Amino acid sequence: MKNTQTNGTHPIIDKKPNGTLNGDHQEYPTFSQEKLDDSIKRGIDLQVFRYPSTGINVLIAGAGLGGITCALECWRKGHNVRIIDRSPSPVWTGDNVQIQPSAILLLRHWPDMGYEIEENQYDVDMSYYRQTGERIWGPAPPMFNDPEHLPGRRGFPSVNAHSRIKLYRAFLKQAERVGIYVEWGCKVVEYWEDVEGHAGGVVLENGEKRTADIVVAADGLRTKSMTIVPGMPDQLTTSGKAIYRAGYPVEHALKDPTVREMWNFKPEDKPIWQFWLGNGSHNMMCLTHDLAFWSFIHSHAESASESWIPDIDPAEVITEMEKNDAVHPAIAALIRTAPKGSVVNWQLKFRDPHEQWTSPGGHVVQLGDAAHAFLPTSGNGATQAIEDGVTLATCLQLAGKAQAANATKVYNKLRFQRVSCGQKMGFVNQQLKQHTDWDAIMKNPALIRSRYPKWVWSHDPEAYAYEKFAEALTHVVSGGRVPLVNTNFPKGHKYRHWTMKEVQEQIKAGQKLEDLQDGDWS
């Protein structure tokens, strides 16, 4: 990848690739004793080490977190990478994003990016309240940071909460450090593959064609790859829910006397993260040293859109909240502090799990939301997209150019069951907060905590791909005659296909989703 700009790129930094060890050119920088000690103590690479070239050409369509992760890891694993995106420039909107430890592991190989993200993340404890103001539980860290889970953990810390804008900027900057520049304004209208020619490709809106050994569809829920992936549901299904969400400078919130009185928050204090639960809905609020975030998940309304255009009046949010339950005055006050142009109302749509993420020949492969939709209550969508990128790049490295098309199928087999179980956890958390069993919670308030299962956060996607690749490849090339036994989802669980409609009917019938699952989902 040449370190040059092309039409449509919008560089975040203006630097040449940093000193990397890539088999061709080696630089040996000096490091401070402090950095050397930290590298040894926490298991963080001193610099980015690039593996020898595989000769595999990878084209990634979609420069979200999953797509950028895939680009970075494909570069690190020795592949040739290009990345395009339909947006005319980077999208600097969004509020907060949750990243679990299994995805944070990636940063140990990208130290500059890791230190930047570590500096900007929000170390939050979580509390849970009723809309009356009654505290249920907390403050306490997310489950994966309970004291008993911390010994032996290495790499950068995972504290769960990040500014989406800061996190995304760090990923883009790291890509540019190694010479990967996103080509913006490239809208894909069609995917194709030529099995005999061992290639996949895309057609852009302007009629231009791009081709590569492997094409990664990382272009979101409405991916155009659905026409080339067998068995993929054509339509997205509404979940019946939508989410108001906002993020803006914290000084707007702290100007309000009711907000100041309720939370007594100062920018130098530890961030506050609270869930407020009502009748069939819930909202989240967070105050940090520089930003305020809040969200409210509610029953689907016609005003909800599929656009991130922040054009919602905060008064609309309060009106919608009052349909379910009385709104605490402090929550209403906080919502009113959102400045114009900061609030979105986003439909929560879902696509039932589909087992195949590749084109028939394997030259086109889906990643992130294009392969699997997550509800925000899972706190897991971005994490799984990052895991996807790590896994796919590793499978391509192990397969080599001759088996690259089979590598995408291996990636698919390693990921599907895990991701499908993760998707179901979004409904578990939704039921917990919107169909709360208050009798059980009053007996044991800790049961209200958001579920962050150990089988999710303790996973190492790179190590798992190295461990399972040969077994999975044999499974693929044998046409499934040789079994593959995945171990990256709940222990003891026997996977079976499920649908959103089935889960919603179970919730409506008053059945607890957690109690219906076999195996250990904790």
Swiss-Prot record:
Its cofactor is FAD. Pathway: Polyketide biosynthesis. FAD-dependent monooxygenase; part of the gene cluster that mediates the biosynthesis of fusarubins, highly pigmented naphthoquinones responsible for the coloration of the fruiting bodies. The non-reducing polyketide synthase FSR1 is responsible for the condensation of seven acetyl-CoA units to yield a haptaketide. After rings A and B are formed by aldol-type cyclization, the PKS-derived product is released as 6-O-demethylfusarubinaldehyde. FAD binds at residues 164, 369, 382. The active site is at 245. Induction: Expression is repressed under acidic conditions, while the expression is induced under alkaline conditions. Expression is induced in presence of sodium nitrate, and repressed by glutamine. It is an enzyme of class 1 (oxidoreductase). Residues 1-27 are annotated as: Disordered. PANTHER family: FAD-DEPENDENT MONOOXYGENASE MDPD, MONOOXYGENASE. It comes from Gibberella fujikuroi (strain CBS 195.34 / IMI 58289 / NRRL A-6831). Coiled coil: none annotated. The keyword Magnesium does not apply. Its EC number is 1.-.-.-. Pfam families: FAD_binding_3 (PF01494). Keywords: FAD, Flavoprotein, Monooxygenase, Oxidoreductase. Belongs to the paxM FAD-dependent monooxygenase family. Disruption phenotype: Leads to an alteration in the product spectrum, with an accumulation of fusarubinaldehyde. This is FAD-dependent monooxygenase fsr3. GO terms for molecular function: FAD binding; monooxygenase activity.
